[in-house]
Curated annotation (Swiss-Prot):
It is a single-pass type II membrane protein. This is Heparan sulfate glucosamine 3-O-sulfotransferase 3B1. It is an enzyme of class 2 (transferase). Keywords: Disulfide bond, Glycoprotein, Golgi apparatus, Membrane, Signal-anchor, Transferase, Transmembrane, Transmembrane helix.
């Protein structure tokens, strides 16, 4: 047996001397409370992080850009507004030539508002909550115009926590209407109560069927049109086309049907799109003027916060987007957002934004301004706003 100790006891008789006992387990209740507290802390952190990202998110830095495709179609003689005997014929293409998206001169595919960069991906935390809400048809649509600054406006609006927008252009009301509203709705992001669903497709403004189709979806849809001096818009359109197809004819040769006679070729989409008054007429047959907002592409560059204030009021949103969200990029000459959506870093959208335009002869610019002047004045009258292009 074991060694005897004083008092006649063996070492085996002394509890815990050579065989230490494990500590008693913690009470089950205490263990459960600790686990519950840890889970609560993790959930609270994720919730606050998601909220912070939603409230401070800003879209990728926006630069108003240039360029698009050139198209030609068989002309049809039309007269300029307020002129009984036009100095030069206005030849419009067939009804669907602008909306078809087929470019005989430079190939298919809208380049302007099919942004060269995909929108920023949502953060993992935001994705955790992406299953909330439901998909709704858009309550507001940016319908035009191409190369006017629609991508800039949409990205600026995405700073607002109550605006949810589709990143790519759906082209539903001009190219995919046959797929039905259920297909269209499925393209939309999920929204919560109080949030607005938006999309932008600039070609809608020059698509004759679009006004009736959007009205059939909802007569209450709010429409936003970003417009820009039609001469600089046409040059911007051409500039982007030139970057994709360096072998296309010169701007001057595409502008005129007969250079010596000074006849403008309005079958070229770069010229046709700038006839804003003509394109606005069918929209006013389906929507009251009060449901349309006309945004200045020039002021979107010089005073983005001012134009965004008008847009937020039009959409019934709280004025959250202000001067503090923007800074001016001296290199490109355009405003940018201080924070990209889903991150805290500034970012300018698109390396092609702010690129130099080709030099156009002064005489060509003068003839174009003379051509557009009556259409511009008619547009000012129709919208109640002088954009100062003349």
């Amino acid at each position: 047996m074991g060694q005897r100790l004083s008092g006649g006891r063996s070492c085996l008789d002394v509890p815990g001397r050579f065989l230490p006992q494990p500590p008693p387990p913690p009470p089950p209740v205490r263990r459960k409370l600790a686990l519950l507290f840890a889970m609560l802390c993790i959930w609270l952190y994720m919730f606050l992080y998601s909220c912070a990202g939603s409230c401070t998110a800003a879209p990728g830095l926006l630069l108003l850009g240039s360029g698009s495709r050139a198209t030609h179609a068989q002309p049809a003689l039309v007269t300029a507004p307020n002129e009984t005997s036009p100095k030069m014929p206005f030849r419009a293409p067939p009804a669907n030539s602008l909306a078809a998206g087929k470019d005989k001169t430079v190939g298919a595919g809208s380049q302007e508002e099919q942004s060269p960069e995909a929108p920023d991906s949502p953060s993992p935390i935001s994705s955790f909550f992406s299953g909330a809400g439901s998909k709704q048809l858009p309550q507001a649509i940016i319908i035009g115009v191409k190369k006017g600054g629609t991508r800039a406006l949409l990205e600026f609006l995405r700073v607002h926590p109550d605006v949810r927008a589709v990143g790519a252009e759906p082209h539903f009301f001009d190219r995919s209407y046959h797929k039905g509203l259920a297909w269209y709705r499925d393209l939309m992001p999920r929204t919560l109560k109080g949030q607005i669903t938006m999309e932008k497709t600039p070609s809608y403004f020059v698509t004759r069927e679009a006004p009736a189709r959007i009205s059939a979806m909802s007569k209450d849809t709010k429409l936003i049109v970003v417009v820009r001096d039609p001469v600089t818009r046409a040059i911007s359109d051409y500039t982007q086309t030139l970057s994709k197809r360096p072998d296309i004819p010169s701007f001057e040769s595409l502008t005129f049907r007969n250079r010596s006679a000074g006849l403008i070729d309005t079958s070229w989409s770069a010229i046709q799109i700038g006839l804003y008054a003509k394109h606005l007429e069918p929209w006013l047959r389906h929507f009251p003027l009060g449901q349309m907002l006309f945004v200045s592409g020039e002021r979107l560059v010089s005073d983005p916060a001012g134009e965004l204030r008008r847009v937020q009021d039009f959409l019934g949103l709280k004025r959250i987007i202000t001067d503090k969200h923007f800074y001016f990029n001296q290199t490109k000459g355009f405003p940018c957002l201080k924070k990209a959506e889903g991150s805290g870093k500034p970012h300018c959208l698109g390396k092609t934004k702010g690129r130099a335009h080709p030099t156009i002869a002064r005489e060509v610019l003068r003839q174009l301004r003379d051509f557009y002047r009556p259409f511009n004045r008619k547009f000012y009258q129709m919208t109640g706003r002088d954009f100062g292009w003349d």
